[in-house]
Amino acid sequence: RVNQVTPKLFRKASNPLKMSKLSQDAIYKIIKPCGLGPQKSKAIKKLSQILVKEYQGKVPQDIALLEKLPGVGHKTASVVVAQAFGIPSFPVDTHIHRCAQRWGLTSGKNVVTTERDLKKFFPIEEWNKLHIQIIMYARKYCSARDCYGLECPICTSSVSYTHLRAHET
């Protein structure tokens, strides 16, 4: 839903200054389909104001600075630096976490551990590309409910296949 809502929001306000001038209610009406609209609209309004006041309307290219902004967690900050600025980062969402576990690339129980493991496993120059590729692959072949090692070509040939087969029924 974010990918559907973002273009609509950016048509209304294409930069932090314009965004900061929108009312919280106007932002809410656009982003409501994403869920948590009241909290997210408040965060978007506030972070836009901060970007204008403290960063001259520019988005910081540093994960630590981004994480200090309202509503911006580690994954979002990582996506921004990777996709907007091309800075190597390996954002781990639920799709990537699930696939990495199924494929035997991590035994991590959370995205922090999974991110650490994937960064060790893959070369830094591949991180940004792999982030997108794994998400797209997961959506097509290895969804949360539908993949038990049978539909996913990687799961059927990975070290996790035996584990997945053992948990079917």
Predicted feature descriptions by range:
Residues 1-165:
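Catalytic cores of DNA base-excision repair glycosylases
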